[in-house]
Amino acid sequence: MPEGLNLRLLDVLGAAADALVDELDADACAISRVIGDVLILVTERVQAGSTLQSGQGYLVPDYPQTGEVLETRVPRTLTLDDPDVDAGEAAILRALGYGSLMMLPLEINESTWGLVEVYRMDRRPFTSADVARAVELCKIT
């Protein structure tokens, strides 16, 4: 991919992360590239002085709910109050200081390119309207 196209995509992804946080009353957003079974953070929108970067990628098989989103291409929301939240997903949320998460696939050219994660510090769940808006904001053409 030409360098100019890569920069344009990063600009588009950064703008999408900004819009998701602003429009969904969220506290943070991460957009990661999926390469095989690994998620690599490519852009984030967080509060000043913080990061979602862990220093390494995440292995998708370690997080079954994330894997399900990537495989089925169906968005998923969860909170730390959910009885069926995966222990690995819950541990990451707690470590990052968040209580609610929306995950959705990022599709480019009709294939799953990456994962979008939108976070809230509180445990207030994302609504179906939030999910619908996130899907619209993540359409990359």
Report the location of each language-model feature.
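Short regulatory/linker helices and ligand/cofactor-binding micro-motifs at input modules
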Residues: M1-A19
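GAF sensory/regulatory domain recognition
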Residues: D18-D22, C29-G57, P61, T66, ...
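Regulatory sensory and allosteric helical modules in signal-transduction proteins
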Residues: V34, S50-R94, M102
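A short, aliphatic-rich beta-strand micro-motif
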Residues: G99-E107
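Short glycine-/small-residue motifs
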Residues: M103, G114-L115
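Flexible loop/coil segments at beta-strand boundaries within sensory signal-transduction domains
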Residues: E107-T112, M121
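Amphipathic alpha-helical "output/dimerization" segments
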Residues: I108, F126-T141
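Short beta-strand-to-loop transition segments that serve as allosteric relay/switch motifs
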Residues: L115-P125
